[in-house]
Amino acid sequence: MKLSGVLLLAIVLPLAFVSALATAQADGDIVVQSIAEAEVEVINRDGRKEKKREPVALAVPGSQVIYTTRFTNKGVKPAGNVVIDNPIPAHTVFVSGSAFGANTAITYSANGGKNYDLPGKLRINIPGGAQRQAEPRDFTHIRWRYVGELAPGKQGEVGFRVVIK
């Protein structure tokens, strides 16, 4: 079954300019669920400070948002070739080194998702016809390629952090 589990899911925060659109492709029935969270400091039962994630209620310039996409194989067969693509929302900057995802190969795009590669290999055009190495602030998309097959009923999780401009 090719691409039978493609699902688009948008997360729109109260600030209309902050959004993410995750897509999943696979040989199987993959369902994705995305969430935008902020890390907050709370006092636990022992009176100690600890960090906790909560859904974003308000994102203001300078604040950090964590985008997480959970993907689940809802089919009866293992799903292969699982790929999660996520654009970096407009008016945000990717936090270098923040992309995560167990059992995934992570690549980036600096040209609107046309091409993906490792950060050190990405180049962007600059005025005058020259090129320079892309920096995290230039990244437009992140791609996670799940390594191996995702068993029926199993779930994976990928994500990244951004700072609101």
Labelled PLM ranges:
Residues 1-2:
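N-terminal secretory signal peptides that target proteins for export/translocation
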Residues 8-17:
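Bacterial N-terminal signal peptides
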Residues 5, 21-165:
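Exported/extracytosolic protein signature
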